[in-house]
Amino acid sequence: MDKSELVQKAKLAEQAERYDDMAAAMKAVTEQGHELSNEERNLLSVAYKNVVGARRSSWRVISSIEQKTERNEKKQQMGREYREKIEAELQDICNDVLELLDKYLIVNATQPESKVFYLKMKGDYYRYLSEVASGDNKQTTVANSQQAYQEAFEISKKEMQPTHPIRLGLALNFSVFYYEILNSPEKACNLAKTAFDEAIAELDTLNEESYKDSTLIMQLLRDNLTLWTSENQGDEGDAGEGEN
């Protein structure tokens, strides 16, 4: 199948909400080794975000059930085995994406915007691995996630407007990483607040085509700040952080 047919297949799969098919088509496009267009890049990102998102959600549900069945050994064992099955699927998906990023996408990126997009993605997928990892493995995935986010962050500050949706989305996810993975609420809040304030100060640089995306992410940054501030004051809140 040539590239245009694979892209068309990915679009059909998206309409049908068959994200595994969508991811497979965009993986094949990526493996052809050309730099992806913005549209192709977004198709790849949406496909894998849905594929991995389903497993992350399942993992949380089963982990919660497992904790509630501590008194029943048989039920707990079943819960643990099922969680491990979901974990293996999640790890395979993340490793697939990370291989595409390292082998094709980051090295082929010619524009700073693309480089930031892919490094953010690398940070995200190592973060997803960190959520289910333990011991030395967790230390490695956490360090890899932070390194990718930090590199993306440095480039975005140098090369992109504070209102750019990719720069804002990176700040959003990097702050979630600090809050959820590193348990550093102060750093998370500082990062999110700085990104929000810098974007507000330059609202006049917002272009029409990205206005909706940028303002949505700014809203998520503000929502997270509100949630995190209330949690740190001792309120019991639902830790449903917004991510991009």
Swiss-Prot record:
Annotated positions of the Phosphoserine modification: S184
Sections of the chain in a coiled coil: none
Superkingdom of origin organism: Eukaryota
This protein's record includes keyword Phosphoprotein: yes
A Pfam cross-reference name: 14-3-3
Modification N-acetylmethionine occurs at: M1
InterPro entries noted in UniProt: 14-3-3, 14-3-3_CS, 14-3-3_dom_sf, 14-3-3_domain
Interaction with phosphoserine on interacting protein, annotated site positions: R56, R127
Predominant location: cytoplasm
GO biological process: negative regulation of G protein-coupled receptor signaling pathway; negative regulation of protein import into nucleus; positive regulation of transcription by RNA polymerase II; protein localization; protein targeting; signal transduction
Cellular compartments annotated: Cytoplasm
CC annotations in GO: cytoplasm; cytosol; nucleus; perinuclear region of cytoplasm
Processing after translation: Phosphorylated.
UniProt keywords, alphabetically: Acetylation, Cytoplasm, Phosphoprotein
CDD domains assigned to the protein according to its UniProt record, in alphabetical order: 14-3-3_beta_zeta (cd10022)
TM regions (residue ranges): none
Gene Ontology molecular-function annotations: histone deacetylase binding; identical protein binding; phosphoserine residue binding; protein domain specific binding; protein kinase inhibitor activity; protein phosphatase inhibitor activity; protein sequestering activity
Function, as annotated: Adapter protein implicated in the regulation of a large spectrum of both general and specialized signaling pathways. Binds to a large number of partners, usually by recognition of a phosphoserine or phosphothreonine motif. Binding generally results in the modulation of the activity of the binding partner.
Quaternary organization: Homodimer, and heterodimer with other family members.
Recorded family membership: Belongs to the 14-3-3 family.
Protein's UniProt name: 14-3-3 protein beta/alpha
Gene: YWHAB
